[in-house]
Amino acid sequence: WIMGHMVNAIGQIDEFVNLGANSIETDVSFDSNANPEYTYHGIPCDCGRNCKKWENFNDFLKGLRSATTPGDSKYKEKLVLVVFDLKTGSLYDNQANDAGKKLAKNLLQHYWNNGNNGGRAYIVLSIPDLNHYPLIKGFTDTLKQEGHPELLDKLGYDFSGNDAIGDVANAYKKAGVSGHVWQSDGITNCLLRGLTRVREAVANRDSGKGYINKVYYWTVDKRASTRDALDAGVDGIMTNYPDVITDVLNEAAYKSKFRVATYDDNPWETFKK
């Protein structure tokens, strides 16, 4: 999965997919009542990027729905996975469940079109704080209460705080989650980060008894770091330059081992070599 980083304006969806992304990451900010408000990152952000592009959250969802609904004039067949980077740092811990409920209602209405031929992409809820695990239950309970438990098949999870793998496993236990888990690891492109924890996550994924199904590394903009991440066995790479990742995947060393995921590849299934 080539994951376009910080795609917060509707126009950027096309831009990143055209460069080779089959997945995008979008920032979601919340107001003081735990309502998802904007797709917005703000300053500071990755080096070499405009941090200030934004949409109202529901407008972005509608644009995303167009891009992922077969038959729509804006449809992009390649775009199969969306990571919502939930900026819950502005919320109190006791608002996490509420944030999940409100997020689910917004997605149900504006992205999934109340279950009536909505967008088809798989969705990952990426949460920065382990204490905010109740967001997951708020979200999943709401889908069930609204009569759309089938949409849970399209839903995955990530804790993005680079916490110890054991602590993340614990948070999922508390949240009642088993399966559909992506584990992120990374840092802004302005800084360097080794692959120690990525290798630990990959080992958990491949052990057959860990909690992780997929591992992604962020934010990778250079060919050398792309090769290192692929050598470590990641499933996804988040990048500001999808064309760089595409180029490396076409190199002889990687062409036979990796391919770009399509809609038929289940993002919740651990790949068996």
Curated annotation (Swiss-Prot):
EC number(s) per entry: 4.6.1.-
Entry note: cofactor: Binds 1 Mg(2+) ion per subunit.
Record's GO cellular component terms: extracellular region
Distribution of this protein across tissues and organs: Expressed by the venom gland.
Disulfide bridge map: C45-C51, C47-C190
Alphabetized CDD domains for the sequence: GDPD_like_SMaseD_PLD
Catalytic class of the enzyme: lyase
Biological process, per Gene Ontology: killing of cells of another organism; lipid catabolic process
Pfam families: GDPD_2
Cofactor: Mg(2+)
An MF annotation (GO) of this entry: metal ion binding
Catalytic residue positions: H5, H41 (nucleophile)
Keywords, alphabetical: Cytolysis, Dermonecrotic toxin, Disulfide bond, Hemolysis, Lipid degradation, Lipid metabolism, Lyase, Magnesium, Metal-binding, Secreted, Toxin
Subcellular location: Secreted
InterPro entries: PLC-like_Pdiesterase_TIM-brl (IPR017946)
Source organism, top-level taxon: Eukaryota
Ligand binding (Mg(2+)): E25, D27, D85
Main location as per UniProt: secreted
Reaction catalysis annotation: an N-(acyl)-sphingosylphosphocholine = an N-(acyl)-sphingosyl-1,3-cyclic phosphate + choline; an N-(acyl)-sphingosylphosphoethanolamine = an N-(acyl)-sphingosyl-1,3-cyclic phosphate + ethanolamine; a 1-acyl-sn-glycero-3-phosphocholine = a 1-acyl-sn-glycero-2,3-cyclic phosphate + choline; a 1-acyl-sn-glycero-3-phosphoethanolamine = a 1-acyl-sn-glycero-2,3-cyclic phosphate + ethanolamine
Job description of the protein: Dermonecrotic toxins cleave the phosphodiester linkage between the phosphate and headgroup of certain phospholipids (sphingolipid and lysolipid substrates), forming an alcohol (often choline) and a cyclic phosphate. This toxin acts on sphingomyelin (SM). It may also act on ceramide phosphoethanolamine (CPE), lysophosphatidylcholine (LPC) and lysophosphatidylethanolamine (LPE), but not on lysophosphatidylserine (LPS), and lysophosphatidylglycerol (LPG). It acts by transphosphatidylation, releasing exclusively cyclic phosphate products as second products.
Family membership noted in the UniProt record: Belongs to the arthropod phospholipase D family. Class II subfamily.
Protein name (database record): Dermonecrotic toxin LspaSicTox-alphaIA1i
The species this protein was found in: Loxosceles spadicea
